[in-house]
Amino acid sequence: MASQREENSTQMQNEVVELAYSLARCKLENLLNKSMRIRMTDGRTLVGLFLCTDRDCNVILGSAQEFLKSTDSLSQGEPRVLGLAMIPGHHVVSIEVETESLQTTTHGL
């Protein structure tokens, strides 16, 4: 009887993990092709469209632009066009999704 309870407990834990994984996946899928701003450990900021991520939290941005950290707090200077960029997960400090990008939805026919 105790082994039955342990088995049920393990099964419930597995279901909770699967549900959490499914919810996280849905949130990530909703962010696909949305404009993101990623701040990195070296002070650079990359802005581009979120294309994908992996289990190591690396992020791929499309149409990416790089902004260097400026010593002058009023200007960031001209962006450098990167195109497709891979940001290693361990270099990510923060990720912001542009609200305009979240409000815009595309409807397929």
From Swiss-Prot:
Domain Sm: 23-101
SUPFAM superfamilies named among the record's database cross-references: Sm-like ribonucleoproteins
PROSITE patterns: SM (PS52002)
Keyword entries, A-Z: Cytoplasm, Nucleus
Pfam annotation, one family: LSM
One Gene Ontology molecular-function label: RNA binding
Domain of life: Eukaryota
GO biological process: negative regulation of apoptotic process
Bridged cysteine pairs (disulfide): none
Keyword Cytoplasm in record: yes
Chief location: cytoplasm
GO cellular component: cytoplasm; NatC complex; nucleus
Protein's cellular compartments: Cytoplasm; Nucleus
Subunit field text: Component of the N-terminal acetyltransferase C (NatC) complex.
Assigned protein family: Belongs to the snRNP Sm proteins family.
Chain's role: Auxillary component of the N-terminal acetyltransferase C (NatC) complex which catalyzes acetylation of N-terminal methionine residues. N-terminal acetylation protects proteins from ubiquitination and degradation by the N-end rule pathway.
Protein name (database record): N-alpha-acetyltransferase 38, NatC auxiliary subunit
Protein species of origin: Danio rerio
